[in-house]
């Protein structure tokens, strides 16, 4: 299965009548492996900050997490594995695997829990595949 198929079929899939606003699979260096049409362009320093937060949980909490210059308030994740952010009625979930970052961005009416489920399910699968 191609990386684009993972995005299209597993991240942008319908969940209880709703879809993520955008999604992508990125390398740890920020290289885009696959993305949905509306996925925002990360800046290199944003990826650096996110990766540092995985290595040093809590690193982004004081400043917030920036994605394409949009600021997300960092909320509880799983240290070293999942980071989550909230912005207004939407948010972001990022799951780190051995080689990739699985990213989902949502807006209402999708819930944070639905976004977490979609992103983390694919991320857990990729971890089991050694990716």
UniProtKB/Swiss-Prot annotation:
GO terms for cellular component: cell cortex; cytoskeleton. This is Profilin-9. Binds to actin and affects the structure of the cytoskeleton. At high concentrations, profilin prevents the polymerization of actin, whereas it enhances it at low concentrations. Its main location: cytoplasm. Belongs to the profilin family. It comes from Phleum pratense (Common timothy). Signal peptide: none annotated. Phosphorylated by MAP kinases.
């Amino acid at each position: 299965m191609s990386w684009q198929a993972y995005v299209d079929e597993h991240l942008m899939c319908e969940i209880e009548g709703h879809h993520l606003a955008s999604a992508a699979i990125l390398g740890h260096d920020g290289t885009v492996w696959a993305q949905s049409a509306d996925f925002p362009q990360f800046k290199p320093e944003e990826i650096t900050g996110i990766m540092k937060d995985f290595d040093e949980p809590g690193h982004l909490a004081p400043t917030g997490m920036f994605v394409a210059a949009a600021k997300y308030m960092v909320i509880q994740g799983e240290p070293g594995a999942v980071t989550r952010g909230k912005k207004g009625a939407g948010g972001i979930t990022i799951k780190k695997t051995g080689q990739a970052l699985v990213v989902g961005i949502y807006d209402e009416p999708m819930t944070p829990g639905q976004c977490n489920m979609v992103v983390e399910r694919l991320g857990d699968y990729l971890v089991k595949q050694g990716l």
